UniProtKB/Swiss-Prot annotation:
Pfam families, A to Z: NDUFB10 (PF10249)
Name recorded for this polypeptide: NADH dehydrogenase [ubiquinone] 1 beta subcomplex subunit 10
Biased composition annotated in UniProt, kind: Pro residues: 11-21
Membrane topology: Peripheral membrane protein
Annotated GO CC locations: mitochondrial inner membrane; mitochondrion; respiratory chain complex I
Amino acid sequence: MPDSWDKDVYPEPPSRTPAPSPQTSLPNPITYLTKAYDLVVDWPVTLVREFIERQHAKNRTYYYHRQYRRVPDITECKEGDVLCIYEAEMQWRRDFKVDQEIMNIIQERLKACQQREGENYQQNCAKELEQFTKVTKAYQDRYLDLGAYYSARKCLAKQKQRMLEERKAARQEAAA
């Protein structure tokens, strides 16, 4: 159906209400109010905002590039040095978050490869699968059984237990 019709064939019926006269003796106050609002409020605010945006565009700060200096490990802290222990704990927490992000990235790569390759993912994604297993093993060795109240001290104790178990297994292998 066409959007417009032939006005010669189908004329519009005459309107029963009189057409409003656009010319009045009094001007419309709403137009004056909107112009006054634009000049008094909107224009200065827009001008200031554009100025601020230009200044921010010149001096853009990239927050994700913040680099923290490495602090000593908790094993290097003296026994009563609370500040050193606190800094080592915060460094360990940052390392923990970085390791979590690395795990997420490797997992996303493996999922993308599995999605892309379909049923043949074990053959075609062997490199990603091997990398994922290595990273997962290292992550689990370090952080798996720390519990909800994890800390650098608990992680260090877990690492010590793991090293003792490895030494014991190596001694038993050498003896056998």
